[in-house]
A protein has these predicted regions:
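DNA major-groove recognition helix of helix-turn-helix/homeodomain DNA-binding modules
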Residues: 76-91
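N-terminal flexible/basic segments that precede or flank functional cores
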Residues: 1-36
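Conserved hydrophobic/aromatic packing and binding residues within compact polymer-binding modules
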Residues: 38, 52-53, 63-66
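Alpha-helical residues within the helix-turn-helix
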Residues: 43, 54, 83
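DNA major-groove recognition helix of helix-turn-helix
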Residues: 67, 93
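Central "turn" residue of the DNA-binding helix-turn-helix
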Residues: 46, 57, 68-69, 86
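Short basic helix-loop element that most often maps to the first helix and adjoining turn
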Residues: 37-51
Length: 94
């Protein structure tokens, strides 16, 4: 547990115990995995949402919506986020 409360991983594990939630999560799994990677990369760099937004050239509210899953970003936007985090964007079709 972190100082701020329950960790993302703990929260996700707890929520996945609910069958209805788990089914919906599986449908949205690629989106949640991307969000999780973005949040993890940002936190590993001790970067705030505001700092990431500045690097990306967008508003903090867009980063907040992205991280909360309330935003359907373009590939170009995701590429900017990845680059701002020192990462590469990779898309795979299975």
């Amino acid at each position: 547990m972190t100082k701020a409360g329950i960790s993302f991983d703990e929260m996700k594990e707890d929520m996945l115990k609910d069958e209805e939630f788990r089914i919906e999560y599986e449908k949205l799994k690629p989106r949640y995995e991307a969000i999780e990677q973005i949040i993890r990369a940002r936190k590993e760099q001790n970067m705030t949402q505001s700092e990431l937004a500045k690097r990306v050239g967008t508003q903090k509210s867009n980063i907040s919506r992205l991280e909360s899953g309330n935003y359907n970003p373009s590939l170009d936007f995701l590429a900017k986020v990845a680059e701002s985090l020192g990462k590469n964007l990779s898309v795979t079709l299975n």
